[in-house]
A protein has these predicted regions:
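Disordered, low-complexity segments in secreted/periplasmic proteins that are enriched in proline
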Residues: 19-49
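Short tryptophan-centered beta-strand motifs in secreted/extracellular beta-sheet-rich domains
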Residues: 102-104, 170-192
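Secretory/extracellular carbohydrate-interaction modules
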Residues: 83-155
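Beta-strand-rich interaction surfaces with strong enrichment in secreted/lumenal proteins
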Residues: 87-94, 165-173, 213-215
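Short, aromatic/His-centered strand-loop micro-motif at the edge of beta-sheets
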Residues: 154-180
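Bacterial N-terminal signal peptides
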Residues: 7-16
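Flexible glycan-contacting loops in extracellular carbohydrate-active proteins
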Residues: 202-227
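Short carbohydrate-recognition loop motifs
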Residues: 68-88
Length: 234
């Protein structure tokens, strides 16, 4: 990623990137130069726009959408996201290549009005411009998952449509749903896990694996996120 471009985007608000001052807030663990070569994150301007976690950016799927209701904050031992529009959230320092694992535990605190997805993304490149690309692994409250690639404004399913899997916990009687998701990037294979169980595997060449890792969150959700981390595989 070109750091200068990302700064320009935030300052000019000419693309759908929004950010908050870095300021030492909580968030990704193991922050610093990822194995992708120490590109690091650019300095953040002290803007609000609902992103209140130090060092994190947000990018809306549609820059014309209203940010009304968007809030991303630290809460307890983790992060809390209330949306708002469909978007990704990320710390640009989490820029990785080579074997690594991205994971987080998500609790949807109340039922969504319809089936809305949330989860993780990896391989983020050019997130500051209209050539953005990344691969995301998301679930819904109906217990289904999807793996999809975004290239610019185009999205394509990696392996079929929404699929049921018994490993994905559905909401309880109170409407809360908790699942730990992980993406394990190996040298040749990428494994997608829910609550420690493999739900899918793909050849590494079929998905985006080099770049920024972060969160993918659909519209109108209220999520508590615990233990977001990216770690080098041994």
């Amino acid at each position: 990623m070109h750091k200068g471009l990302l700064v320009a985007v935030v300052l000019a608000l000419s693309l759908p990137a929004i950010a908050q001052d870095r300021g030492g807030g909580a968030g990704a663990q193991g922050r610093g130069a990822g194995p992708a070569g120490g590109r690091g994150a650019p300095p953040r301007p002290a803007a609000g726009n609902g992103i209140e976690v130090g060092g994190w950016f947000g990018r809306l799927d549609d820059p014309k959408e209203s940010r009304t209701g968007l809030k991303f904050v630290t809460m307890g031992t983790g992060l809390h996201a209330t949306t708002g529009p469909n978007m990704i959230l990320f710390d640009a320092d989490e820029d990785w290549e080579g074997p690594y694992t991205t994971k987080a535990a998500f609790t949807m605190t109340k039922l969504a009005s319809h089936e809305v997805a949330y989860g993780l993304f990896v391989g983020g490149q050019d997130l500051d411009n209209d050539k953005q690309r990344y691969t995301y692994f998301v679930i819904r409250q109906d217990g289904k998952f999807l793996i999809r690639k975004r290239t610019g404004a185009t999205v394509a399913n990696v392996a079929g449509d929404w699929t049921d899997h018994a490993a994905i916990q559905k909401p309880n009687a109170q409407g809360s749903q908790t699942n730990e998701l992980a993406i394990q990037v190996g040298r040749d294979t990428v494994t997608f896990l829910a609550n420690g169980q493999t739900v899918a595997t793909q050849p590494a060449k079929a998905v985006d694996v080099v770049g920024i890792s972060g969160l993918r969150i659909g519209h109108g959700l209220d999520l508590q996120i615990e233990g977001f981390s990216v770690t080098q595989a041994k």
